[in-house]
């Protein structure tokens, strides 16, 4: 039997899982339908589609990890399961981070204005090389996840020895301690793509400032399309920074939770907050993307009419 706190955790994480799958699945579905109709897909939609697929994987791994560690800690003490979950989490986490970074860099290159030769060269080449860049991100994520699987597997013998010397609760702490150092290290390495996204954000803000100074010379009475594009992209990046900050902090909380007296509560809280990043940011993408927002309005209108009939 689960405690009231466990039931609340189950309700919250299930609700977040459903919303995350619906939000990311909706983006993938709209882009896929548009791809079928037009027989081609834009670079933005291509990156978005790959991004939401990686987020669906990340959401699934977070939910599985949360349910197992919070509700069935005795099952989690099995080293092979820990290795499998940690490996898949690392792969999905890195893939999502790099794909998000690609989207942020793409926004910057397409929207920002600059006369720098390197910027102009990247602006011309980005559409042609984006598929190779995403493939490279996939390869990096796969390599990192394989490395962590190898590193964690080395502790299997020590884990097997500890199994005969400690009870379930103590062994849970031991097993978490085994994976603390490599997981923390690879958590820190995820800062690299985030720094690239942060640089793109500040450069885009700088581009908007320069553009605003230029249009002030002309009393147009409103914002031009370039300004609107800058603002939408900056809002998207700002929401990403906010959600990623929450995700990163709570991921570290989950990693360090074995040091806390109430590790189960810390673990549950960390998992619930962490899933907000891959779920919540996707809804921001829908709101700030004209095509996705208009498609959602049409869909909701059809649902409303169907319910009335």
UniProtKB/Swiss-Prot annotation:
SUPFAM superfamilies: Family A G protein-coupled receptor-like. The chain crosses the membrane at residues 8-28, 51-71, 83-103, 132-152, 185-205, 240-260, 267-287. Glycans are attached at residue 167. It is found in: Membrane. Residues 1-7, 72-82, 153-184, 261-266 are extracellular. It holds the Pfam family TAS2R. The keyword Transmembrane helix applies. It comes from the Eukaryota. Disulfide bonds: none annotated. InterPro entries: GPCR_Rhodpsn_7TM, TAS2R. One of its GO terms (molecular function) is G protein-coupled receptor activity. Most taste cells may be activated by a limited number of bitter compounds; individual taste cells can discriminate among bitter stimuli. Receptor that may play a role in the perception of bitterness and is gustducin-linked. May play a role in sensing the chemical composition of the gastrointestinal content. The activity of this receptor may stimulate alpha gustducin, mediate PLC-beta-2 activation and lead to the gating of TRPM5. Belongs to the G-protein coupled receptor T2R family. This is Taste receptor type 2 member 8. It comes from Pongo pygmaeus.
């Amino acid at each position: 039997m689960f405690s009231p706190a466990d039931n609340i955790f189950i309700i919250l994480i299930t609700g977040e899982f459903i919303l995350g799958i619906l939000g990311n699945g909706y983006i993938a579905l709209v882009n896929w339908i548009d791809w079928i109709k037009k027989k081609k897909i834009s670079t933005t939609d291509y990156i978005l589609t790959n991004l939401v697929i990686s987020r669906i994987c990340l959401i699934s791994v977070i939910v599985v990890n949360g349910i197992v560690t919070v509700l069935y800690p005795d099952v989690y003490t099995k080293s092979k399961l820990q290795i499998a979950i940690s490996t898949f989490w690392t792969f999905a986490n890195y893939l999502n981070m790099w794909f998000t970074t690609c989207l942020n860099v793409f926004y910057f290159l397409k929207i920002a204005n600059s006369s720098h030769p390197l910027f102009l060269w990247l602006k011309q080449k980005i559409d042609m090389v984006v598929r190779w860049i995403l493939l490279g991100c996939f390869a990096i994520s796969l390599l990192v996840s394989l490395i962590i699987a190898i590193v964690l597997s080395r502790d299997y013998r020590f884990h097997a020895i500890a199994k005969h010397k400690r009870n379930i609760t103590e062994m849970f702490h031991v097993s978490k301690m085994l994976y603390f150092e490599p997981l923390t290290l690879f958590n820190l390495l995820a800062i690299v793509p985030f720094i690239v996204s942060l640089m793109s954000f500040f450069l885009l803000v700088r581009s908007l400032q320069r553009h605003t100074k230029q249009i002030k010379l002309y009393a147009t009475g409103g914002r031009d399309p370039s300004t609107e594009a800058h603002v939408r992209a900056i809002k998207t990046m700002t929401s990403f920074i906010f959600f990623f900050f929450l995700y990163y902090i709570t991921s570290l909380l989950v990693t360090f939770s074995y040091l806390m007296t109430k590790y189960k509560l810390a673990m549950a809280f960390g998992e619930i907050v962490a899933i907000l990043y891959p779920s919540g940011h996707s809804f921001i993408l829908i709101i700030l993307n004209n095509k996705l927002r208009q498609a959602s309005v049409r869909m909701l209108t059809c649902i409303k009419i169907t319910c009335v009939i």
